[in-house]
Amino acid sequence: MVENVENNNFNLYERVYISLSRTVSNFECISEELKQETITEALKKSQVINEYVKYQGKLLPFHMFVFEVKKNLLSKNLEG
């Protein structure tokens, strides 16, 4: 059971990473460490329910979850 959850999180990580790479300009210029940290942090706070992701108390379609992660990533990139 735990293995299945880990696989689902890994698949979600990949989906988020790929979506961000397609939607964030200069994605390749952002450090891999920051990308991994931001995505992992968001996944720890989320739960997949059918085709939606529960994140920070909101049930979001996947593309809106990616948008939230994108905002966090760009904000952290500007700070650091």
What does each model-found stretch correspond to?
Residues 46-68:
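Short, aromatic/basic-enriched loop-to-helix "N-cap" motif that marks the start
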Residues 1-25, 29, 43, 58, ...:
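A short, charge-rich alpha-helical start-of-domain segment used by transcription regulators
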Residues 67-80:
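Arg/Lys-rich amphipathic alpha helix in sigma70-family domain 2
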Residues 31-35:
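Short amphipathic alpha-helix in the helical subdomain of ABC transporter nucleotide-binding domains
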Residues 22, 42-43, 51-52, 77-78:
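Enrichment for repetitive, rod-forming helical segments
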